[in-house]
């Protein structure tokens, strides 16, 4: 039986690990990130992959840095025939890449060489793409640059956000892995080199990318809002206070109002002017210190009036 070490951390990785177990491989160990403090109370919380591994009685390693010699030895002592990674969050050192006889393969949530890096799902929506997918490739020491083994395309719906697209890609990635691993083991594959000239990158989201610039066209802001939902969430300001914007809808009507101006309130939210004479309807938001709410509840509370301007004054945390 093929001995596999799985490396992954967030929810995306869980169906991938589960597939390996269900397909009957001997998952001899799981490597994931350390437990981290979570929420307002900073409660130490295990990564989703750790919880899944423990449910199946699989040994778990949680190195802060997998590149350290002692951590490499721990992984190799498990004698893996194959290492499979999915959203692990660390680049593997050469000793690990060279260890297993079938190599190391990675399940990456984009159609490589596009969107290499840690936030491919976010960027596929932020950039307004109509499709993305999952690529399984051999791992090398360079970020997401190894030879590609298999791919699957996934359509991005107009209403998808990072959460819904994440779930689609996670399921697609698990299915693709189930089809790919037997071919990797048998050698029945023809890996394809990535075209470096077509490589693009999806680095982790920075704080400045979360702030809405109302001078941008409505389509771009619409993609920003859904491309940051459910994490880290786009924000603007109202009366000097930060306000998270969870969801919006495009508005067909043109406007000559200055970007950021509240044009009108509607039953299900507020219509805000954006760049190029466009506008957006904010349908779900979260004022500072309050719970997430529907736009209709915000309007009912008379929290905003036509003529108010979003995006001015305080733009810090």
From Swiss-Prot:
Keywords: Protein biosynthesis, Transferase. It catalyses: L-methionyl-tRNA(fMet) + (6R)-10-formyltetrahydrofolate = N-formyl-L-methionyl-tRNA(fMet) + (6S)-5,6,7,8-tetrahydrofolate + H(+). GO terms for molecular function: methionyl-tRNA formyltransferase activity. Its EC number is 2.1.2.9. (6S)-5,6,7,8-tetrahydrofolate binds at residues 110-113. Signal peptide: none annotated. Residues 292-317 are annotated as: Disordered. Pfam families: Formyl_trans_C, Formyl_trans_N. One of its GO terms (cellular component) is cytosol. Belongs to the Fmt family. Attaches a formyl group to the free amino group of methionyl-tRNA(fMet). The formyl group appears to play a dual role in the initiator identity of N-formylmethionyl-tRNA by promoting its recognition by IF2 and preventing the misappropriation of this tRNA by the elongation apparatus. NCBIfam families: fmt. This is Methionyl-tRNA formyltransferase. It comes from Bacillus velezensis (strain DSM 23117 / BGSC 10A6 / LMG 26770 / FZB42) (Bacillus amyloliquefaciens subsp. plantarum). The lineage of its organism: Bacteria, Bacillati, Bacillota, Bacilli, Bacillales. The gene is fmt.
